Design a protein with these regions (language model features):
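Active-site neighborhoods of divalent-metal-dependent phosphate/nucleic-acid chemistry enzymes
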Residues: 69-116
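Conserved beta-strand segments of alpha/beta enzyme cores
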Residues: 34, 71-73, 125-127
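Short glycine-/acidic-enriched loop or helix-start segments at secondary-structure transitions
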Residues: 15, 84-86, 121-124
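Short, well-structured N-terminal submotif of metal-dependent ribonuclease cores
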Residues: 1-37, 49-61, 132-133
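Short, conserved alpha-helical segments within structured domains
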Residues: 41-42
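Charged phosphate-binding loop/patch that engages nucleotide di/tri-phosphates or the phosphate backbone
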Residues: 106, 110-133
Length: 133
C-alpha cells in the first residue's frame, strides 16, 4: 500500500529546520511502503521552498530528487470535485484535505499528515504521523 504525503509531511521530510523534521524522518524510516506525491502536495512544497528563499533551480533539483526516489509514485490530480465527499467540511482549508483523502481512497492508499483534524475527519484513510512533544 502506498501512502500519499500531505504537504506538511513532505516539507518536514525535506526541510532540516522544520519543527517536525526529526519526527518525519523517524516515521519515514520505519514505514514499509511506497510513498506518493501529487501536484497539490508538490506545489505546496515548491511554494514553501521558494518562500524560504531557495532559488528556482535548487527547487527543481529537490523535486527531481523526490521523483527519482525508488519508493516514489506520482499520483495525478485526476478527480473532479463533484466526486469529493464534503461531509464534515466546514471551512475552506478543509477542501484540499478532502481532495487528498479521496485521492488516497481512490488509489487504494493512505494519507499521511500531522494534522489531527484531518486525521480525525478522514480516519478511514488518514494516518497521523507521530510528533515528539
Amino acid at each position: 500500500m502506498t501512502v500519499l504525503l500531505d504537504t506538511n509531511v513532505l516539507v518536514a521530510l525535506l526541510v532540516a529546520d522544520h519543527v517536525h523534521h526529526e519526527a518525519a524522518e523517524t516515521w519515514f524510516a520505519h514505514i514499509d511502503r511506497r510513498f506518493a506525491t501529487c501536484p497539490i502536495t508538490e506545489g505546496g512544497l515548491v511554494r514553501i521552498l521558494i518562500r524560504q528563499g531557495q532559488p528556482a533551480e535548487s527547487v527543481s533539483s529537490v523535486m527531481s530528487a523526490v521523483s527519482s526516489h525508488p519508493g516514489h509514485e506520482f499520483w495525478p490530480d485526476d478527480l473532479p470535485y463533484r466526486v469529493i465527499p464534503m461531509t464534515g467540511v466546514i471551512g475552506h482549508r478543509q477542501v484540499t484535505d478532502a481532495y487528498l483523502a479521496q485521492l488516497a481512497r481512490t488509489r487504494g492508499g493512505r494519507l499521511a499528515t500531522f494534522d489531527q483534524g484531518l486525521a480525525k475527519l478522514h480516519d478511514d484513510v488518514a494516518d497521523l504521523v507521530p510528533t515528539k512533544g
